Amino acid sequence: MNKFYVKTDSELRILITNAATKMKLSEEVVEKDYWISFLLDYIFNQNRWSNSFTFKGGTSLSKCFNLIKRFSEDIDLILDWRLFGYQDDEPYIQRSKSGQNKFNLEMNEKVTTFLKDEFVKVLNEDLKEFNLEFWIDPNDPNSVLCKYPLLFEPNYLFNKIKLEIGCLGKWTPAEHVKIKPLISQVYPDVFKEYSTIRTINPERTFWEKALILHSVCNKPDEN
């Protein structure tokens, strides 16, 4: 059973309302954080491919390390390329530019096929009892959208959770981090256990974001 399962909607509504009031947050933020935490626990502890995922990105900085205060709505995941039969360092073998592009395209096609034909199917089978629905984002074959049962009308947040999943990033350095929903900051005894999530080291995440910012700032002027 999921570590963050709450039996009834009425109980969950009370927990979210009171936590939001005490933390001076909107109910929709606390509600979405609850379902993000729920999904993370499932992916890293109950899903059949749990050992092949690593959590990364801005949401990991706020959720796992409390290093940024911005509420991040998406779940970014690295999928271990060894799941598809590649060797540890196969993506880094010396290739021509066209050869590397071909390799990257082949790997990405394997990921999107896996997500569409296997991963989404298992998500819907495993989590249908919690009224969660999953499908491939029609605008991005590397993303899975999750519709969760809304107890509060969203005002500014996207009312789906997006799982962004790629295979081209290295899954190290990583560490195992314990998380709970925001609700536990007000009700520490509601969830008896933490969920342990394998997460990319925050120094690497900051470094990657710095490189992205550098590349954007140094992009040639098209004019």
Ranges and model annotations:
Residues 8-11, 18, 37-41, 48, ...:
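Catalytic cores of NTP-dependent nucleotidyl/adenyl transfer enzymes across multiple folds
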Residues 79-113:
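Catalytic palm subdomain of template-directed nucleic-acid polymerases
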Residues 28, 32, 67-68, 104, ...:
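Short secondary-structure transition/capping motifs
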Residues 23-24, 65, 200:
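Residue-level detector of alpha-helix boundary/anchor positions
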Residues 44-75, 79-87:
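Active-site nucleotide-donor binding segment shared across nucleotidyl transfer reactions
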Residues 67-68, 91, 176:
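Short aromatic-enriched loop/helix-cap "lid" or pocket-rim segments at secondary-structure transitions
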Residues 1-38, 87-95:
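N-terminal regions immediately upstream of nucleotidyltransferase
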